[in-house]
């Protein structure tokens, strides 16, 4: 058989690429192929984090993202999930963080037993990065410490773990000199680094910086914490990630939707135009 010309080789290569692309598109469009991260309803959610997790300066406890997320999940479950907020202001990931001495203690890696494993959650949110970035923790050290926290937890329990990026904030001079070592670019690098840890450690990642749209009016007047609106955006994005990865959040809806009463009535709207 004579060798193929350059034109024939190019045509064959393009044809193979087209077939491969079509096959990939078909596989992506086929239902039922996506991984299900949690097939049952959640029983207990624990949020481990810093001041925004604790509530920041939301106008009341029910407007904190932890409470809002818990309400959203419970709205779609037949059985109520317990919600436990273990946020501490100025908290950091580890005793090895350079800003540890200025932080709210104990650090995350010091408080895993009483604040996580003893509680036996099946949904765990570990929200760190904002204070470590502001306090000068090198990203590589932060990633190593976050990985250590996740692996320590999984020696005892195996919850679904969700880890978000830092929250959006506007005043990188606030909080005093120990907390002035970050900017928005560093926050985005942290977000990428946290995503890398999530992929390596079998966790779900939530990009809160992207969710914020960099809208300054979602931030509290102190320039650091989320406003009530910001807390709602955080909860919404976390719920979106959970709902699109966990079939357990659809179980109750799937059970009741076929027998639900048909409540829609557009007859007046049609009658307005003679139909």
Label the model's feature ranges.
Residues 57-58, 86-107, 134, 223:
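Acidic/histidine-rich helix-loop elements
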Residues 27-89, 96, 112-120:
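Serine-esterase "nucleophile elbow" of acetyl-processing enzymes
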Residues 5, 52-53, 165:
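Ser/Thr-centric signal marking residues that sit
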Residues 1-16:
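N-terminal secretory signal peptides and thylakoid transit peptides that target proteins
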Residues 23-25:
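Boundary at the C-terminal end of the N-terminal hydrophobic targeting segment
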Residues 71, 77, 103-259, 263-266, ...:
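Alpha-helical cap/lid subdomain in secreted, periplasmic
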């Amino acid at each position: 058989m004579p060798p193929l010309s350059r034109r024939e080789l190019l045509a064959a290569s393009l044809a193979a690429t087209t077939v491969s692309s079509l096959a990939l598109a078909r596989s992506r469009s086929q239902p039922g192929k996506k991984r299900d991260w949690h097939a049952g309803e959640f029983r207990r959610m624990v949020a481990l984090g810093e001041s925004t997790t604790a509530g920041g300066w939301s106008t009341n406890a029910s407007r904190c993202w932890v409470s809002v997320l818990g309400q959203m999940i419970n709205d779609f479950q037949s059985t109520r999930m317990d919600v436990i907020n273990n946020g501490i202001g100025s908290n950091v990931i580890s005793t090895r963080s350079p800003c540890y001495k200025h932080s709210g203690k104990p650090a995350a890696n010091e408080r895993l037993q009483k604040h996580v494993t003893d509680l036996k959650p099946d949904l765990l949110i570990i929200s760190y990065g904002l204070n470590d970035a502001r306090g000068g923790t090198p990203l590589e050290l932060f990633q190593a410490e976050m990985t250590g926290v996740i692996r320590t937890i999984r020696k005892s329990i195996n919850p679904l773990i969700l880890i978000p990026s830092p929250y959006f904030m506007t005043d990188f001079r606030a909080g005093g000199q120990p907390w002035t070592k970050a900017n928005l670019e560093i926050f985005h690098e942290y977000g990428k680094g946290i995503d890398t840890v999530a992929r390596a450690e079998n966790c779900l990642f939530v990009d809160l910086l992207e969710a914020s749209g960099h809208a300054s009016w979602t931030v509290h007047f102190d320039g650091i914490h989320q406003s009530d609106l910001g807390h709602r955006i955080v909860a919404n994005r976390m719920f979106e990630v959970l709902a699109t990865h966990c079939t357990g959040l659809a179980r109750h809806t799937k059970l009741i939707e076929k027998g639900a009463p048909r409540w829609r009535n557009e007859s007046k709207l049609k009658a307005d135009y003679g139909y």
